Amino acid sequence: MPVRFKGLSEYQRNFLWKKSYLSESYNPSVGQKYSWAGLRSDQLGITKEPGFISKRRVPYHDPQISKYLEWNGTVRKKDTLVPPEPQAFGTPKPQEAEQGEDANQEAVLSLEASRVPKRTRSHSADSRAEGVSDTVEKHQGVTRSHAPVSADVELRPSSKQPLSQSIDPRLDRHLRKKAGLAVVPTNNALRNSEYQRQFVWKTSKESAPVFASNQVFRNKSQIIPQFQGNTFTHETEYKRNFKGLTPVKEPKSREYLKGNSSLEMLTPVKKADEPLDLEVDMASEDSDQSVKKPASWRHQRLGKVNSEYRAKFLSPAQYFYKAGAWTRVKENLSNQVKELREKAESYRKRVQGTHFSRDHLNQIMSDSNCCWDVSSVTSSEGTVSSNIRALDLAGDLTNHRTPQKHPPTKLEERKVASGEQPLKNSTRRLEMPEPAASVRRKLAWDAEESTKEDTQEEPRAEEDGREERGQDKQTCAVELEKPDTQTPKADRLTEGSETSSVSSGKGGRLPTPRLRELGIQRTHHDLTTPAVGGAVLVSPSKVKPPGLEQRRRASSQDGLETLKKDITKKGKPRPMSLLTSPAAGMKTVDPLPLREDCEANVLRFADTLPVSKILDRQPSTPGQLPPCAPPYCHPSSRIQGRLRDPEFQHNMGKPRTNNLQLHPHDAFNDEDADRLSEISARSAVSSLRAFQTLARAQKRKENFWGKP
């Protein structure tokens, strides 16, 4: 709170020493200076004691000069001023009747004339100092013009002067401030604060007209103009660009809609010419609307109003970028809903395991099944050995289930001579219609079975005669004199077994009969491979040297010969166990004897051994190609021991020595030794483990989709 006391008392503020040329030469005495010293308060005109200092702001009146302080004597200019003698203060007595009303009227007039109008107390000392000088001058004027009681006639006409001339400007400013009107601030630099000195008053005088106190109330005079609002209409950019609802379009013919069936170009990025055209169109529409009578808006839709903003600015999902511009995609809900429903149904069927679609049916009934059944002539697996294919799970699974009683023929070299006939048969199948092809295919399976049985009976009869006569070469000659027409069938069967994996060589799904013929499929989830040997083997390389076939053939035949001698001493063999395929009807033999019937199977395969052995010993001629080795895997070439056994890659006992007996020209081949270590035989313990794993795999396959 600022300090308002600046060292000036109330007396010093109200009664200042008037300096003049007389005061310089005048040196008053002490009695003259303090002529009022020792007088009573009633003699000095003080009728009451001063009140306590209060913080409440009260109206302040300038001090009134009593009559006994007024100067009644003449003033001499050259002589010194003599203070007048104070007159005794006399109160009118109530007993005096002659002074009655006249004395009261004179007292009222004298008080009204001597009183200065009320003013508010200022807050700064500077304004108080300025106000003191003004009040002193006014008091002097009042005292000079004031006359004794007899001069009250001169005071009355002065009170009848017009208000606008006699009113004080400070009083007028106070009245306007109380009335709530705009008051122009005083331009006093001393009273301005730091904020007022830096920031000038922004309101102009025209916006806050100055009114007199008698013009506070509004009158009909033309001096004060009527208040007029701002005639300038503010138009925003939104109102200027978007005019609201578009007019209702007239119905158009279908021909017009067909002509404009192309994609509608509604892109947020407009060209430079489009705004000009848009303005011309909007101007023409405005002119048309001014002529026509504005029709009332019809409540056609109660939902979202199709405003101009919604029509021009759509979601980004409804556009696609094409040819350097964003083009609006036309809605085609029917096709989208149909596509989504088809996807949902396919997903549902895939989860439930019933996803047999028309595509699968077309694959089964199509003419291309012959291409899937018969492998390609240029198959890369043709150069792979039979024994390697017997252990290769991924590339040869059906080969172990096909009967092995017919004389073995070399597949790779036989394809070159008889490669034309399988192609002719495949072309015949392609020319047949779908139902005929399916029937013919089934008949072909039966025919193959019958011819295969015939070919199996012939070696049996020849083997019996050979045992009686002991002539091995005659049997070999009979086998070589067989017609070549049976070779394509055998080749076809072997090729089908070679490439009968889960997926065909050309890609696509194998037909259902073919998948059933394959039997149990092996995946990477199985710890062992029981159908072949239980060992986790790497896939063999597809490119083989030409001399590898003869080495595999010799090693397997030697092992079979020694095993035959041991088994024939035990007694009469048991009948063969057959695995019948429900689809193809083809009799197959279990290549891995897991039960007691292993002796019978091995004996039947051993009967065919001398024929193949003689064929191997014969010199190969350029016109006649040597036959292939039997794809059967002899027990001597199986892996012996467990997987973690240190002897896992090595054979033990007598079969091992026979297995390693090679021809003299191939005896010292490192690659052959590596290959033999990969295709090493397994023991009976491993066979039992493989059988248990196979049983678990079959049970898991049967219970995979749940029992019906």
Curated annotation (Swiss-Prot):
Where it sits in the cell: the answer is: Nucleus; Cytoplasm, Cytoskeleton, Microtubule organizing center, Centrosome; Cytoplasm, Cytoskeleton, Microtubule organizing center, Centrosome, Centriole
Q: Using the UniProt record, give the first listed, main subcellular location.
A: nucleus
The coding gene here is Mdm1
- Alphabetical list of InterPro entries matching this protein: MDM1
Motif: ST]-E-Y-X(3)-F motif 4; annotated at 307-313
Phosphoserine occurs at: S124, S127, S284, S287, S315, S418, S555, S556, S581
UniProt-listed Pfam families: MDM1
Question: What is the documented function of this protein?
Answer: Microtubule-binding protein that negatively regulates centriole duplication. Binds to and stabilizes microtubules.
User: Would you identify the family this protein belongs to, as annotated?
Assistant: Belongs to the MDM1 family.
Q: Motif ST]-E-Y-X(3)-F motif 1: where?
A: 9-15
Gene Ontology cellular component terms for the protein in this record: centriole; centrosome; cytoplasm; microtubule; non-motile cilium; nucleus
Name of the protein:
Nuclear protein MDM1
Keywords carried by this UniProt record: Coiled coil, Cytoplasm, Cytoskeleton, Microtubule, Nucleus, Phosphoprotein, Repeat
